[in-house]
């Protein structure tokens, strides 16, 4: 059965327009506001509301009492359901700099979650926040666990994650890191700058 969202202002091409949305076979079809509605269809009246795409959260350390660094597969599901109820349709679990053993445990629990049937937001992959971060701008990161560039370790993590580390936060001023960015990208990881005092020349 098709579903429709009517009378809302739909965010399209950087502006809000009065449109009807038809949801069919998991796809969204944008229709004119006066498009006819199929008999028997489920209709949601969004009058006075804005309709936007689901948000993708690439930096989530936890929610509903769950800390990603200690989360089980079942805990990830709690976050998925909470996120979906608050407008986030996809997310990355952000693993803080931790011991090798704990980071591997986080990866393993993520993989278990991927094999579960679940509802809610889609857990797209893993975001590693560290361990290649500046001690000067460490924030909440445990300084004794921060490291210089270590591609063998990152490759080991990515192999264990079966390619599901999607994003890493690094401080480019950390010794050896700038030269390793191309190799990180070759592993399928998007590289972001954080916990950094890097200037334009870096």
For each of these PLM feature ranges, what is it?
Residues 49-71:
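Di-metal (Zn2+ and/or Mg2+/Mn2+) metal-binding site signature of metallo-dependent hydrolases
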Residues 136-145:
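Glycine-rich phosphate-binding loop of ATP-grasp-fold ATP-dependent ligases
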Residues 1-6, 10-52:
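Histidine-rich, glycine-flanked metal-binding segment
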Residues 8, 26, 48, 59, ...:
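Divalent metal-coordination and catalytic microenvironments
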Residues 61, 77-106, 121-134, 161-173, ...:
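Divalent metal-dependent hydrolysis catalytic cores, especially in the metallo-beta-lactamase
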Residues 101-112, 139:
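Metal-dependent catalytic neighborhoods of phosphoester/phosphodiester hydrolases
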């Amino acid at each position: 059965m098709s579903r429709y969202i009517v009378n809302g202002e739909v965010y399209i091409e950087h502006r809000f327009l009065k449109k009807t949305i038809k949801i069919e076979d998991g796809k969204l079809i944008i229709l004119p506001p006066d498009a006819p509605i199929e008999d028997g269809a489920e209709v949601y009246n969004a009058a006075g509301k804005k309709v936007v795409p689901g948000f993708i959260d690439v930096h989530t350390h936890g929610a509903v009492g769950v800390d990603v660094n200690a989360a089980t597969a079942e805990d990830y599901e709690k976050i998925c359901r909470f996120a979906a109820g608050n407008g986030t349709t996809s997310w990355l679990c952000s693993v803080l700099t931790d011991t090798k053993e704990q980071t591997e445990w986080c990866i393993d629990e993520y993989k278990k979650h991927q094999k579960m049937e679940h509802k809610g937001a889609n857990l797209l992959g893993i975001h590693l926040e560290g361990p290649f971060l500046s001690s000067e701008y460490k924030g909440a990161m445990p300084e004794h666990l921060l490291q210089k560039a270590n591609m063998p370790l990152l490759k080991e993590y990515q192999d264990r994650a079966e390619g599901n580390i999607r994003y890493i936060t690094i401080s480019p001023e950390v010794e050896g890191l700038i030269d390793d960015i191309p190799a990180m990208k070759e592993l399928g990881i998007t590289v972001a700058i954080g916990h950094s005092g890097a200037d334009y020349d870096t």
